[in-house]
Amino acid sequence: MDFGRSRDIISGLPDSLLCHILSFLNTKEAASTSVLAKKWRYLFASVPNLDFDDSVHLRLGKRNPAVSGEDYLKMINERSDQLSTSFMDFVDQVLRLQDNSPLHKFSLKIRDCVDIVRIICWILKVLERGVSDLELDMHLKWKSSLPSKIFLSETLVRLKLSVERGPFIDVEDVHLPKLKTLHIVSVKFEKHGIGLNKLLSGCHILEELNLEYISWCLWDFVSVSLTTLKRLTFCGEVMQDENPISVSFNTPNLVYLMFTDAIADEYSTVNFDSLVEAHINLQMSEDQVEQTRFSDSEGNMEGCMVANATELIMGICNVKILYLSVYTLEVLTYCCEAIPLFNNLTHLTIESNSEVGWESVSGLLKNSPNLETLVFKGLVHRFTDKCGDMCLCKPWEEDEEEEEDEETPTCLSSCPVKVLKILEFGKIYDDEIEKRIDQVKHFLEKIPDIEQLILHYNTPVDEDVIKVYQQLRRHPKVASSKCKLQLISDNLSLSSKDCALFGID
């Protein structure tokens, strides 16, 4: 082999492989390869993925310190117009070069002034070429509706529309026979809930649906009814003083739910029969929160229902994996008639902060008979006398007789949890860390079958980590002799491995 001569090894690769490699580059980078040789120009014309992002083109460069005031603003506007025109010409040129070759993905991200007429032409062009993955992320002023042909595509498999301040969806006919994934972000529907229903009715094999930051608090109703749906992200634009009127779900084959919304006035239908994993962030309005605070101050929390989310909570009771935000804990306390039985639940994650108490946590644990892993994202919670026996702010700890009675039953003593994880334990060693250590000890004293405690301590101070580790490891009063400790920090990971914990050799 002659190593003295340079060889163009890459150009010798098969054209199909080169096109595949180019498809991973953004379109500006891929287009730059066309100047290498005539072969590369033809290769670029066959690239199946096009990714246009005006932020890549609209870079103004460094500011000239000699130019300021109105002259600088004028220069910026002129330069911005030039770059915008350059971007539009580039997109036109690429689409013209590719002509009618097959197209897999077309992604368009726009944050600046681009001619809407040209945008529509680009969309129609790629639809004519049979694009299967269309992503439009546009933040610009566009008063009309999106092109109706988007919703009459025989080839689209994935569609993502994020058009903040942009066009709205107004469809009379929807025919998307191959669409499996639909993302709708910050989009306005001309006919509100009716418009959404119309859109979904034309997606006969849809499996994944993302509805994010849509103002359905202003709608008469919002409904998702799809028997083919498997994954749903339902994220409302939560308003401080508004609640949705009516929300319903008929999704019997759904297995994954990500839910963020204010409590609706009613949940007329909730069908999550196949649900396996749910992330729930359900929130009260400001007025509802104020009502709960007033009830607490008056000592009248019992029976105080400021809203009713019972039907929604009942609908998720079949899950195996459940993530609850701190606001959802509050909803379970003040907006749920009773906590249902979570018979299938094996993994529960609870978020906590100083503004919300643990009143509902005790009921959750009592009604989760098969729970194996319990995760707390933070241990700090609002001090109250209504946390029950979950924590150390329980009112009966001041009663010496009950404190001395080791047989006092607690929700923890019947808790089947084997793995306890504490995330965001703290950052610096102070009095608050001591309180959290006491809370962890309380868990260890009461949970009978715990086999592993994993604690994440967000500190770079190794001495503090060792101090916490030793306190927990040497704690003598532990319900389970099988429990192993692992403490993870920024720099360290300490583990008792196979050795028995807390003074047991």
Swiss-Prot record:
Organism domain of life: Eukaryota
CDD domains assigned to the protein according to its UniProt record, in alphabetical order: F-box_AtFBL13-like
Cited InterPro entries: F-box-like_dom_sf, F-box_AtFBL13-like, F-box_dom, FBD, FBL60-like, LRR_dom_sf, LRR_FXL15/At3g58940/PEG3-like
F-box domain: residues covered: 7-55
SS bond partners: none
Protein name: Putative F-box protein At1g58310
UniProt source species: Arabidopsis thaliana
Lineage: Eukaryota, Viridiplantae, Streptophyta, Embryophyta, Tracheophyta
